[in-house]
Amino acid sequence: MRYKRMYIIILAYILALFLAGLVFDDPADILPGLQKIAETQDVLITDYVAIAGPGAAFVNSALVTLISTAVLFLARCPLNGFTITEIGLMSGFALFGKNVVNIWPIFLGTWLYARIQKEPFSKYSSTALLATALAPLVSYMGFGSLYAHPLGGIITGVFIGMVLPPLSAYTYKVQNGMNLYNMGFACGLLAMMLVPILTAVGDAPSSVLYWAEGYNRPFGAAMALMCLVFIVGGLFFSGRPAWAAWAGY
């Protein structure tokens, strides 16, 4: 199947993210930057480029993308348009809220839910990835809350990972498939319950603004190159003549 070769393309994309991190920043700053990213409270708006530099941000994106791909592969979840979209979401938001630390408790919670239900994790692997929309809450409970403790972040993430599979199944019935962002809807409902609870105990998250500027040209050039590679790859490496690939589009 044509989607099987996508693993090679995804790995090449991950490598490109690593290389971008090395190009855009001093390699010596990447590991300290990753530590900053892992320990930030992730309250909106937290731009990883602003707090840790572009190198650490891109390497974090590469690592999160690699972990997400590995989760799908080990769960034997077939690659298709939906799962590739999930990988893209993980990659993009790893510049802005998701990191190599705060996604794991949510994965664990979803895995535990699958074990309790006595069902394969592959059935919920996509839910596990999309549930990391609330990964910033894990970081907040671990590093930013008045009651911050790493164990609190882990417990919060496990709770999120266990609650969202049944909640997303319910919200799908509510909107009857009319909302393409069903997991976003479910995550929003859960956040609407959790944040008021924090506010009630005097722990309301305060908004911040870490927003990087001055990268328009280099990032714009990198984005243009990436889009060009995708277009050329789709036209000439899809196993069909270029005109047929274009006609299919």
Task: Walk through the language-model features, giving the residues of each.
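Membrane-helix interface and helix-disruption motif detector
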Residues: 49-53, 76, 92-101, 120-121, ...
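Alpha-helical transmembrane segments in multi-pass membrane proteins
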Residues: 60-68, 72, 84-118, 127-131, ...
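Membrane-interface helix-loop-helix junctions at boundaries between adjacent transmembrane segments
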Residues: 1-3, 133-160, 164-221
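Alpha-helical transmembrane segments
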Residues: 9-14, 184-185, 213-232
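Structural signature of transmembrane alpha-helix termini at the membrane-water interface
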Residues: 19-23, 70-74, 115-116, 138-141, ...
